[in-house]
């Protein structure tokens, strides 16, 4: 092997280790709770944190259970959004939780980083508004009368605090000495895109006040969107993600579209560095489970269809008996009574 090839292999290995470490904090999702943390020494025992995250944990003990919930939200949403794809966000009981999938510069890794940073920002913001955290509360910068004539009141979600904490905790590995590497630039961009998915979908919720339900006075507050909406938005960004490459721009390195004919990506778009594998065959070492045994849709021409999901291997068809409620009747007052019925359905699974 030539010296240049050796150097390239070493760089790829460093990037892989670097990227795996950056996402290891997602292992917190495997814990039932970290709310019982009451001593700084406990932070040292939390699996998956790098040293600077351990230091943040010690300074922010009360916030760590929100970080855990954010990690759980991210994994659950990833599995929902990718439920019909060849790679369906399957997790492992080891580090990193998504296997080596997140160590590659693919669009799947881009989504994982985006939804993870969004999960932390979302969970910490909601914890602020619900009064769980002493360090933050409602957003008091929103007040007075709006141009639309309603009164800002109630508890507006403190998204600024949630985003700031996510930036400090999630981005800490990339902002270290390797922050100029291609993967660090990619991860930082996608982390920020995840948080922007919340910011751009913030909504206004209102309550009317008046006699007999009239709306003589309307008070409103800003609220984060449902996390499912954030997931949908980021899944759309995944579908339209931009393949990029590092390039020297002035005195710094930046990511630019690999295809010069494509328009530049925005801060809200997802970016990736390399094509994805096909995820067809099981590769336990990489954390890829393959698609054998997966349920597929015989009539669909999309990615959930048997032809694509099964990677051309064909599929098995079996008659499966499903139990379901039927003949439901409302009884006064007040309950619904149903019978249990059996129904035969065809189930298709990949060979």
From Swiss-Prot:
Q: Which Pfam family, just one, is annotated for this protein?
A: wnt
| Biological process according to GO | adrenal gland development; apoptotic signaling pathway; branching involved in ureteric bud morphogenesis; branching morphogenesis of an epithelial tube; canonical Wnt signaling pathway; cell differentiation; cell fate commitment; cell-cell signaling
Q: What is its main location?
A: secreted
A GO MF annotation of the entry reads:
receptor ligand activity
Q: Where in the cell is it found?
A: Secreted, Extracellular space, Extracellular matrix
Q: Which family does it belong to?
A: Belongs to the Wnt family.
Q: What do we know about how this protein assembles, alone or with others?
A: Interacts with PORCN. Interacts with PKD1.
Q: What is the name attached to this protein's record?
A: Protein Wnt-4
The scientific name of the source species is: Mus musculus
Q: Which gene encodes it?
A: Wnt4
């Amino acid at each position: 092997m030539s010296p240049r090839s050796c150097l390239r292999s070493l760089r790829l290995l460093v990037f892989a280790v670097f990227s795996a470490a950056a996402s290891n904090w997602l292992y917190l999702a495997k814990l039932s709770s970290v709310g019982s943390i009451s001593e700084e020494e406990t932070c040292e025992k939390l699996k998956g944190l790098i040293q600077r995250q351990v230091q943040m944990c010690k300074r922010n003990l009360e916030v760590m259970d929100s970080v855990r919930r954010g990690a759980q939200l991210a994994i659950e949403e990833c599995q929902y959004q990718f439920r019909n794809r060849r790679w369906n966000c399957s997790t492992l009981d080891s580090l990193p939780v998504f296997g080596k999938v997140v160590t590659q510069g693919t669009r799947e890794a881009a989504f994982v980083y985006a939804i993870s940073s969004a999960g932390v920002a979302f969970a910490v913001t909601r914890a602020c508004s619900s009064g769980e955290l002493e360090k933050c509360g409602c957003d008091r910068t929103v007040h007075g009368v709006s141009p639309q004539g309603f009164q800002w009141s109630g508890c507006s979600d403190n998204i600024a605090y949630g985003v700031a904490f996510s930036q400090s905790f999630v981005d800490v590995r990339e902002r270290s000495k390797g922050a100029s590497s291609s993967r660090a630039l990619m991860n930082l961009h996608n982390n920020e895109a995840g948080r922007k998915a919340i910011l751009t979908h913030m909504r206004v919720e209102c309550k009317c006040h008046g006699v007999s339900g009239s709306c003589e006075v309307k008070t409103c507050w800003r609220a984060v969107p449902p996390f499912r909406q954030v997931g949908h938005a980021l899944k759309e960004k995944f579908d339209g993600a931009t393949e990029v490459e590092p390039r020297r721009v002035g005195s710094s390195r930046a990511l630019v579209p690999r295809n010069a004919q494509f328009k530049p990506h925005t801060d809200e778009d997802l970016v990736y560095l390399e094509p994805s594998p096909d995820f067809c065959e099981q590769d336990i070492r990489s954390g890829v489970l393959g698609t054998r045994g997966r349920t597929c849709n015989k009539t669909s021409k999309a990615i959930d269809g048997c032809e694509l999901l099964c990677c051309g291997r064909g599929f098995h068809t079996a008659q499966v008996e499903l139990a379901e409620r039927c003949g439901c009747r409302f009884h006064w007052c007040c309950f619904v009574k149903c019978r249990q019925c059996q129904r035969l359905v065809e189930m298709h699974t990949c060979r």
